[in-house]
């Protein structure tokens, strides 16, 4: 299965069976990538969900599900001193009140997915949500659950779980999820893109 997409509504499916599908929110996050199977979802959980489910549903209909979902992109550091690329070992949704909903409904609502890792890169826990974290209060709150924060990773992990496809999440630290984050993210992209490409090569993906 192959997909080259410029946004969530324009996606061309190509016949490249049993290969990984590479997923990015913004093409600048991995500008040097040359892959037959690249899905650009745009930023945010809903954009990612619609683009990814469209691609995977079409692929399943044609019997061309990818061998692995590989999400590469940037993340904010919730803990001081983090830098470089991390392979995600656990991902959760930081803006989903699963405990409160479980108490109200009487049914469990799990919020967290464990992922297998290669052992070749540093690992981290990732929190996903639809807010760009750029204030100290939010940073401190979310840091109780994870050390990195992004806006798509949990969606990719959940889609992989639902479709029975292995998942790899690679996140490069682009900012410190603080009041300077919005101003530093764009400047960090070229170096982040290069490091993510090096990580893909290290994992032979």
Language-model features: where?
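Extreme N-terminal starter segment of soluble prokaryotic enzymes
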Residues: 16-21
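Glycine-rich phosphate- or other oxyanion-binding loops that anchor nucleotides, phosphorylated ligands
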Residues: 27-205
